Amino acid sequence: MGLIDNIKKEAMGNRTKIQSSDAAELEKILNNLFYLDKNIEEETKFVEQVMTRGLESQERVGLHASAMLVGEKEFCLRAQVLSLIYKQSQGEQVPVGLMRIFKQGDAIHEKWQRMFIRGNYGSARDMDRTRVCDEYMLSYTPDLDVKIPKFFEGRMIGEIKSVNTYQFQRMTKHPSAWKQAQWYMHLCINRLKKLGKWNVKDYTKGFVLSEDKNTQDFKIEVYDYDSSLVAPFVDRAESIMYYYNRVYEQHKMVPRPKDATSPECKRCKDCFMREACWGIGKGKIKIKE
């Protein structure tokens, strides 16, 4: 075991934070947000935005950026292609225990988003705003799209995560949020490049803010954009578009994975495209074009 590993092990035993100098600097800046007065006008806009979010349509349509980030065992190319053609299963009612957890997570997100507004690091429209990548027929919704001049001269993507105390005390970084941060940075950079508006700095840095939902302590991870880390996600998105176009050009659908043996098998029973894939329930209902 190397020196760094020993330091990490000892720190976890002592419940000590391990952060880069960048992360420590950003944490200090964010701690100052707790002392600021409310920005009534902009926070009111944000609250209205939160309260009216999703009223236009409750139906899930198209790809979501997070679908590119799952592990190999969870990723299903066929399901993603089907989701661009047919309606998705909207799911059963979520158990109340899970709803309580979701609501707590929402509250933590909204608290931080309002504080970033107070710091004048972003406006209401920079918080939880869904964007669309036409190239991949894909939507993505960064928690934060902010600019903190004291820390970095460009705009940054930020992801907020609420975690339990056990996980918070033991983790040196959030297990999956770095993927979101890198992927969203990539999508934002590409969008600006296509518009001819990228200034070389924006979205080349991002961060993850993890809060202990019991103690309100928080940790920061800072990341520089790395195109090599998002290459697998880009490959998946491009594969989906290739096979989607093949459906119309060659009338061939992606075959099911080998372990997708029946609608009731472990691989398929909770799939969001199960009905369209197997022709059961409501079956294949085409999305209106």
List the model feature ranges, each with a label.
Residues 92-93, 166-169, 218:
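Short small-residue beta-strand/loop micro-motif enriched in glycine and branched aliphatics
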Residues 86-87, 161-165, 211-215:
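Short connector loops/turns at beta-strand edges and beta->alpha or beta->beta junctions
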Residues 157, 183, 207-208:
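Structural beta-sheet core signal
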Residues 107, 111, 179-187:
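Short amphipathic alpha-helical face segments that pack within enzyme cores
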Residues 1-157:
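Metal-dependent nuclease catalytic cores that hydrolyze phosphodiester bonds in DNA/RNA
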Residues 136-179, 192:
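Non-catalytic protein-protein interaction segments used by genome-maintenance enzymes to assemble
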Residues 115-119, 187-194:
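Active-site catalytic microenvironments for nucleophilic, acid-base chemistry
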Residues 18, 170-174, 189-289:
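Metal-dependent nuclease catalytic regions and adjoining charged, substrate-binding loops involved
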